[in-house]
Structure formats: C-alpha cells, structure tokens
Amino acid sequence: PLVLERGEEADKRQETVENFWKNGILDPDSNVQFGEGGAGTFSDGKLNTLVKDTFGRGKEVLSRFVEAGAPSEILYQQKPHLGTDQLVGIVQFMRHQIEEMGGEFRFRSTVTDLMIRDRKLNAVIVNAKEEIPAEICILAPGHSARDTFAMLEKHNINMEPKSFAVGVRVEHPQTMINQDLYGEPENDRLGASSYKVT
C-alpha cells in the first residue's frame, strides 16, 4: 500500500509539536492532530474502544502492539495502557514493518482532490499537483481534516456523521478512590483502583 500522510514522520513531528508548545508556532499540517500516528500519538496511550469485539480483532490489534514493543501486560489488562513515552517508538516500528513488506509512506503529502470519472475513482491528487493513479482509496482523516470533508462534499460523496464525545479530566486522590472501591486507602495486592464516570 501507499500511505499518504499530511503531517511529518514521528521524530520530526515531535520536534514540531514541542516547538508549538514552547514557542506557540503552529504548523497547520503537522501538529497534535496530523502526522505519523495521528492524534493518538500524543495521548496518554490508553487502548480502550468500548466496542463489542465478537470476532477477536481487538486481541489481534493488541498482539500487533506487543510485537511492536508494547508491554505484554496489555494482552490481559482490563484497561491496556501504553504510556505516552512508548507510543512514538511503537508507531515507528509498525511503519518499518509495513515498509519491509513493500509498503510505502509519504509524509507531507495531503490528498487535496480526487479524480473521479463515471462515478469511479481514477486518481488522487496530492498537494494540489501530483496525480497518483488509483482505483481504491481509504481515507482516515480523523476529526480535524475539514478540507478533506469539503473535498468529498464537492464530489457528492456520501458521508455520515459519527457521534463525537468530548471529555473532561477529573482528578481524585488515589487513596480516596481505593477507599471507596476497596474499603481501604491502600492495598498492595490489588494495586491502584480504577473507575469511570459517565
């Protein structure tokens, strides 16, 4: 496959994002939303989809993460967690695996248009200048690629809105949560208690 990514590869992207956090200089195409690994690269590394998995795909995905360097504990933890510090390396390892199997990645390559004739895809246009012949194109734009959605609308391609959740972070002392759920503020055998508020 050919993977076109509007942002940078993980190492360069990390520098670009740190420059934004430190100096306030935003790169509109490579930031916390766009770049290798997507928005999840700068998340806390929790891997929970809350989706029923009757076909076992989730287990396969977690196994791939372990092959790429994630801790093996994620295979049996109720709430698997990678940690932000490991995500960049894991994402890079996965890219190298795909490249070794013949896949190609192009960074700083935004799909700016589609060439459609007789309701069939003929090519994708990259950065408004390069035409790449294609009959199949899988778009994975995330939430922030409004220009991509506008381009799809221009071509009368049907789209359906996905439900969108916005969360807030609420912090409670761990001893309080342990007391409420375990009946004691600390328990070495059980570890830290977790909970979810909805």
Each model region followed by its residue ranges:
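Residues forming the flavin
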Residues: 1-46, 50-198
